[in-house]
């Protein structure tokens, strides 16, 4: 049985290096791996000894914490209906644009994100009690990247309007088309990130250790760049701003430098995780395998961001959106000339959450002189991620 356990853990730890958010599982035996310090010797006394004090029981560790998520499995968390203009029904020619909101099927409902990445570098600190329990925290910085179908971001615009561009700008009309054949991606800046947690070695038998941990992490980075890759309305915004809690139609100045009532787009990231893991010590190597249950959310307050445009018309247009049918003829005196151009385009950053809650983690810890340790871990199923942890005991 011991040989089988050794084989399974060693295989899992070694195979993890060949496979490849932001919370690692960690080695369940970590509280008891470093039993000596670089400044003070460890104390292996009996907790029930009346001569033992809490000073003897407590020790500190510090080190580097790096967590790199290459693909977090996320989906949108939105309502089934979305308020926008009625769907066009005219088969030929142009039509009068809708001016009232209608409840339509939300194209963002249940959408899966194509890619979600997060990279964290931090300092970690742990308070150890009796070489069995850890209370720890991390302080550092995170940055991220999100990519998904434009329907996940409710990219909408006005199409087929019988009015010219100047009249559309009066804010009387609402978008009637959902653009779902394109891609939206965003990059965040590097922002402060922190996490707290606790880990305990629950059961030990020889060299095997069964442990559990609980962690919580939070960060709120701003959106650094937003790219909309759409043939009908392609644009890029650096440090985008938008409207929070405002329904369509947007203000007349939306997307211009004169826009008011906007705020910086930021993403509020929260995650909590519970895990159970088993390790087996083999001299200086301690491989482990664990399961985890976590929930993560990315909330941008459903901020709506308008396509950048000119405050004044240039050649009777305010954007460089192409004509779909190639028949656009810009004339101020003639209506319907821009009916085949996408107008008043905007999108919103919807709330996202974990699509899968359960995952597995495999890794190994290398301990040197019972004072220093380096842990390497990879996580699968609910995310593809790698973790590196290097620490020492005082």
UniProtKB/Swiss-Prot annotation:
* Family to which this protein belongs: Belongs to the chlamydial porin (CP) (TC 1.B.2) family.
Subunit (UniProt) = Part of a disulfide cross-linked outer membrane complex (COMC) composed of the major outer membrane porin (MOMP), the small cysteine-rich protein (OmcA) and the large cysteine-rich periplasmic protein (OmcB).
In which domain of life is the source organism classified? Answer: Bacteria
Q: Enumerate the UniProt keywords alphabetically.
A: Cell outer membrane, Cell shape, Disulfide bond, Ion transport, Membrane, Porin, Signal, Transmembrane, Transmembrane beta strand, Transport
GO cellular-component terms in the record?
cell outer membrane; pore complex
Task: Write out the GO MF terms.
Answer: porin activity; structural molecule activity
The main location class comes to: membrane
Q: Which Pfam families match?
A: Chlam_OMP
What is this protein's name? Major outer membrane porin, serovar B
Kindly list the places in or outside the cell where this protein is found, as annotated in its UniProt entry. Answer: Cell outer membrane
What kind of membrane protein is this, topologically?
Answer: Multi-pass membrane protein
Signal peptide: which range, if any? 1-22
Originating organism: Chlamydia trachomatis
Could you provide one GO biological process annotation from this protein's UniProt record?
regulation of cell shape
Relate the protein's function as given in its record: In elementary bodies (EBs, the infectious stage, which is able to survive outside the host cell) provides the structural integrity of the outer envelope through disulfide cross-links with the small cysteine-rich protein and the large cysteine-rich periplasmic protein. It has been described in publications as the Sarkosyl-insoluble COMC (Chlamydia outer membrane complex), and serves as the functional equivalent of peptidoglycan. Permits diffusion of specific solutes through the outer membrane.
């Amino acid at each position: 049985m011991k040989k089988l356990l050794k084989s399974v853990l060693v295989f899992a730890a070694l195979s993890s290096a060949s496979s490849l958010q932001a919370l690692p599982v960690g080695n369940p035996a970590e509280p008891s791996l470093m039993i000596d310090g670089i400044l003070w010797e460890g104390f292996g006394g009996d907790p029930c000894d009346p001569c033992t004090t809490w000073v003897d029981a407590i020790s500190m560790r510090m080190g580097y914490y790096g967590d790199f998520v290459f693909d977090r499995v996320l989906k949108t968390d939105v309502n089934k209906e979305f308020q926008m203009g009625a769907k066009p029904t005219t088969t030929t020619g142009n039509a009068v644009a809708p001016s009232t909101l209608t409840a339509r099927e939300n194209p963002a409902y249940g959408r899966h994100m194509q890619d979600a990445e997060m990279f964290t570098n931090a300092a970690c600190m742990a308070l150890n009690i009796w070489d069995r329990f850890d209370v720890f925290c991390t302080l550092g910085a995170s940055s991220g990247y999100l990519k998904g179908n434009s329907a996940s971001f409710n990219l909408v615009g006005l199409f087929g309007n019988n009015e010219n561009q100047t009249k559309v700008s009066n804010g009387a009309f609402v978008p009637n088309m959902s653009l779902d054949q394109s891609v939206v991606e965003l990059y965040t800046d590097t922002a402060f990130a922190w996490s707290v947690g606790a880990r305990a070695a629950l059961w030990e038998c020889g060299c095997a250790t069964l442990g559990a941990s609980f962690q919580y992490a939070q960060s709120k980075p701003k959106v650094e760049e937003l790219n909309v890759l759409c043939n009908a309305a392609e644009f890029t915004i650096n440090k985008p701003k938008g409207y929070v809690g405002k329904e369509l139609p947007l203000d007349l100045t939306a997307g211009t430098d004169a826009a008011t009532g906007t705020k910086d787009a930021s993403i509020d990231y929260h995650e909590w995780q519970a895990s159970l893991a088993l390790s087996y010590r083999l001299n200086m190597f301690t491989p482990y395998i664990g399961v985890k249950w976590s929930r993560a959310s990315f909330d941008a307050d459903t901020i709506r961001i308008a396509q950048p445009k000119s405050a004044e018309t240039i050649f009777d247009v305010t954007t460089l959106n192409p004509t779909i049918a190639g028949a656009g003829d810009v004339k101020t005196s003639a209506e319907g000339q821009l009916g085949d151009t996408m107008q008043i385009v905007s999108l919103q950053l919807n709330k996202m959450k974990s699509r899968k809650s359960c995952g597995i983690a495999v890794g190994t810890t290398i301990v040197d002189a019972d004072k220093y340790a380096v842990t390497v871990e990879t996580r699968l199923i609910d995310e593809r991620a790698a973790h590196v942890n290097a620490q020492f005991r005082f």
